[in-house]
């Protein structure tokens, strides 16, 4: 079992994801397809070892910045995470460090992140990173919409015309 957290930069904040949910981290790549009827923070899908995985602009999803284009994130990274609902790619502005410190509970959760935070970690003498709850990053409705669009994308194209 993996322990600790990966420190990420999301817009101007330092956040963390628990290592047990992270499969791999890679440099940002352009999506290979767009999804249509999904929230604006969904950038499209990327190929992860032969599987199409939805790519989420994590800072935009958290309300830390407006939705961005893949080009605006070209210097960023993708944290591929595995949840009970499947594989997801989380586009972030930067990846900094692995920390194996004790997580501390929050006394007050930031209003825009209520229910999304597990606790906080000390990153330095003056900085803390909020530890996100990966299972709560996407709502049930958003997961359903994204799943429906992925299913549409996976369908074979219909042939024009009828039987000959």
List each language-model region with its residue ranges:
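An acidic, low-aromatic, low-complexity terminal/linker signal
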Residues: 1-164
């Amino acid at each position: 079992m993996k322990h600790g957290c990966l420190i990420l930069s999301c817009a101007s904040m330092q956040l963390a994801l628990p290592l047990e949910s992270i499969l791999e981290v890679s440099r940002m790549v352009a999506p290979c397809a767009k999804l249509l009827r999904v929230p604006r923070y969904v950038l499209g899908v990327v190929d992860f070892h032969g599987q199409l995985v939805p790519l989420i602009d994590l800072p935009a999803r958290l309300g830390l910045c407006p939705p961005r284009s893949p080009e605006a994130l070209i210097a960023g990274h993708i944290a591929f995470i595995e949840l009970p609902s499947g594989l997801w790619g989380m586009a972030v502005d930067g990846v900094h460090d692995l920390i194996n410190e004790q997580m501390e509970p929050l006394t007050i959760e930031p209003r825009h992140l209520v229910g999304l935070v597990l606790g906080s970690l000390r990153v330095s003498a003056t900085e803390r990173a909020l530890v996100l709850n990966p299972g709560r990053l996407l709502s049930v409705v958003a997961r359903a919409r994204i799943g429906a669009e992925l299913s549409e994308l996976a369908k074979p194209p219909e042939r024009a015309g009828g039987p000959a």
